[in-house]
Amino acid sequence: MTSIIQSPPLNSKKPHLSQDDRINKNNNNNNKMIFQKRTIADNQIQSPLIGHYKLNNNNNNNNNNNNNNNNNNNNNNNNSSSNNNINNNNLVVDECCEKTEQIETKETITKVEDNLNLEVDVDKEIENEIAKYQHLLSTSTIFNGICQDYTDESDNSDEENVDDDDEEEDNKKQKEECEEEEEEECEEEEEEDSDEDSDDDDSDDSEDSDYVEESILNNCLRQQQQINHNGFMNKKYNYIDTNSYFFSRQQQQQPQKINHIYADTSLRMELIELLTVMKNNEREKGNMVEDVCVHEIFL
């Protein structure tokens, strides 16, 4: 017969015992628990194991009970401490709430007092304004104000009257002086005009008599129909020399120099008048006058 040796299991600290070994061990333990001799150095006392085992069990039970009681006491202490902490926290919260309530009540009281003070100030201002208006609306103040205005206006009117009188006198003097100066100037101008009239009567009026508007109109009509041999054409403008008053006179007198001016129909008449006046003034002074031809331009 081959015997099978069982290997001990892994991770086991105790050695593996066979079934017979286990039975023997249990029997030995039981015998030891029934009768056990205990020797003591001083006095040898033999005591049965049963009583000692019971005492040990009781002691163990008592110790366990004491431990449980201690644990219960500790738990109770912990609970009481937690309750105390909770109570303390509640007390702190209550104190904070009371403080905030006190602060809020103080603020509301101060606001109410400020509002009351403002209302009192406003009432005082209203009373003062009412008193002022009553004083202004009283008949005595109105009468006094009207009297003062009347006296001020009368004083101002007197001063203005004095100033107006002075200004009128100054204006009269200035007018008289101006009239005298104008009379002197008029006399001088009359004398000069009389001398000029005498000179003009001696001079010939042939130049003014030669200017006729009808001839100018006829010439304008001719310009639209034909161009004479003295004129010339341009791409943009049509210049005609025969339509000029001064040009026609110079053809008769054989001038030394001729000045040509080109103008629109609306400006041509004004230019001719100005040039005639200028030429007459130059002739009166004894100066030589150059002839000018004013030509019409057609756009």
UniProtKB/Swiss-Prot annotation:
Listed Polar residues bias regions: 1-10
Indicate, by first and last residue, each region the UniProt record lists as having compositional bias (Low complexity): 56-89
* Bias-annotated ranges (Acidic residues): 150-169, 177-212
Q: Where is this region: Disordered?
A: 1-30, 54-89, 148-212
A molecular function annotated in GO for this UniProt entry is: histone acetyltransferase activity
- SS bond partners: none
Which named protein is this?
Uncharacterized protein DDB_G0284311
The organism encoding this protein is Dictyostelium discoideum (Social amoeba)
